A protein has these predicted regions:
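Leucine/isoleucine-rich amphipathic helices and adjacent mixed helix/strand linkers
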Residues: 2-273, 280, 284-295, 299
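Ankyrin-repeat boundary/"N-cap" motif
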Residues: 240-248, 273-281, 307-313, 340-346, ...
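Ankyrin repeat A-helix N-terminal signature
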Residues: 250-255, 284-290, 317-323, 350-356, ...
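Conserved ankyrin/ankyrin-like repeat signature
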Residues: 259, 292-293, 325-326, 358-359, ...
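Ankyrin repeat domain, specifically the short helix-to-loop turn at the C-terminus of the second helix
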Residues: 262-270, 295-303, 328-335, 361-368, ...
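Polar/charged low-complexity regions in secreted precursors and cytosolic/nuclear IDRs
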Residues: 278, 289-292, 301, 308, ...
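Tandem repeat protein-protein interaction scaffolds
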Residues: 312, 317-321, 329-332, 336-345, ...
């Protein structure tokens, strides 16, 4: 409350600082009586012609996963994000003076600071963001056009990110920040924006286009972000194109339920094939922690005990990741609790090594072998002993481990 009062005083002083002496008395009489009223006044003074641009910039500032540089935020003004269409970046719409464009559109609601050599756009005060997403603004008759719905804002930024990535089709060269200012942000955060609420459903057409295997957009991003998943040694394949199994695999890994559903209907055989580093699409979905996607894949015939190139099953992966809910679901649907990988390790080895006590308890409840030896003779109990995890050791001692097993 005290902080809000200081902010209110600051805003009033800013108004008075720019007024002529002859207007001082009138301005004093018209000053807003609260911080909310101050922000309403600022919103009303935003030029009607600039409303759509100001609103878009404010939306991005509300939901951005990191502070945006001036050139990144200004790039949002160059996008055609018409409903129902694929986002298009128009270079002719870019402003020459990007900082002026941002500040003139958003007025005193935002400011620019210098941080580590970059010019960063931020809200002038934390209360600005709070007000823009508040029910108080939503109930206003005139100013409610600036009320920001968070999920819709994620949709806007997701569309822009995909618009940037759709403009890139070179698999080796990363675009310069001068050519595509938003590329760095888009590459890192597009997935997080799509995973919010119903954003994936809203931008379905754009997402389908990005994942189109006949295009190079998705493969261009993928080969930069997941280079270990693909070999370019084959002389029989076009190295710019992805393996046919990669699309479903990565849709599952990223948790795109709607896209996975469309893909398995279109190519049901892909459910069973290795698509990347983790293994099958089912491996990928549980690695990403996406139980709904895993359930969808199982409903379309995925093998719950399918194996990766290293003989890992989905249960091995979830046991190491510590996803108790998914571990329980896999076990209840027939996952082999004592399946061994190429090293002879069972899921219990993985959960013990990772220190996931609750997962270990669940595996033991379903018959996990506490004395199962790996190829080197190591048992889950010896793994716990090496780690010094006291609670884990006590849990395993309840199941009569062979404390002498293993190679010495």
């Amino acid at each position: 409350m005290i902080c809000d009062r200081f902010r209110w005083v600051f805003c009033q002083l800013e108004v008075l600082r720019h007024c002529f002496p002859s207007n001082l008395r009138r301005i004093l009489e018209e000053l807003p009586k609260s911080l909310d009223d101050t922000y309403k006044r600022i919103l009303r003074e935003i030029n009607n012609a600039n409303h759509v641009y100001a609103y878009r910039l404010l939306q991005c500032l509300v939901v951005a996963h990191r502070p945006l540089r001036v050139e990144e935020l200004a790039e949002m003004l160059a996008f055609d994000l018409s409903p129902g269409g694929v986002p298009k970046l128009n270079a002719d719409w870019r402003w020459e003076n990007q900082e002026e464009a941002v500040l003139s559109a958003c007025s005193s609601l935002v400011s620019v600071i210098i941080e580590r050599g970059s010019r960063i756009v931020q809200f002038s005060h934390f209360s600005v963001k709070e007000f823009l997403i508040s029910d108080r603004l939503a109930r206003c008759m005139e100013e409610s056009q600036f009320y920001i719905i968070v999920e819709h804002s994620h949709t806007i930024l997701a569309q822009a990110c995909l618009g940037v990535l759709l403009s890139v089709d070179n698999c080796t060269d990363q675009p310069s920040s001068r050519k595509l200012p938003l590329y760095e942000y888009a590459t890192e955060y597009w997935v997080q924006h799509i995973q919010i609420g119903n954003v994936e459903l809203v931008i379905k057409d754009t997402l389908d286009r990005f994942f189109d295997t006949d295009q190079l957009h998705f493969s261009s991003w993928l080969r930069r972000e997941y280079p270990y998943d693909f070999s370019t040694d084959s002389e029989d394949e076009d190295t710019d194109m992805l393996p046919s199994t990669a699309t479903l695999y990565f849709a599952a890994l990223l948790g795109f339920h709607g896209l996975v559903e469309r893909l398995v209907v279109k190519q049901p055989q892909q459910v069973h094939l290795l698509g990347g580093h983790c293994g099958t699409p089912l491996h990928a979905s549980v690695y990403g922690g996406h139980i709904e996607v895993a359930q969808l894949l199982l409903a379309h015939g995925a093998d719950i005990n399918s194996r990766s190139a290293l003989d890992l099953t989905p249960l091995h992966i979830t046991s190491e990741m510590g996803y108790l809910k998914i571990v329980k679901w896999l076990l209840n649907n027939g996952a082999n609790v004592n399946s061994q990988d190429v090293r002879g390790h069972v899921p219990l080895h993985f959960s013990v090594s990772a220190g996931h006590l609750d997962v270990c308890r669940m595996l033991l409840k379903h018959g996990a072998g506490v004395n199962t030896r790996g190829n080197t003779g190591s048992t889950p109990f010896l793994e716990a002993w090496k780690s010094g995890h006291t609670d884990m050791i006590c849990l395993l001692l309840e199941h009569n481990p062979d404390v002498t097993s293993g190679k010495t």
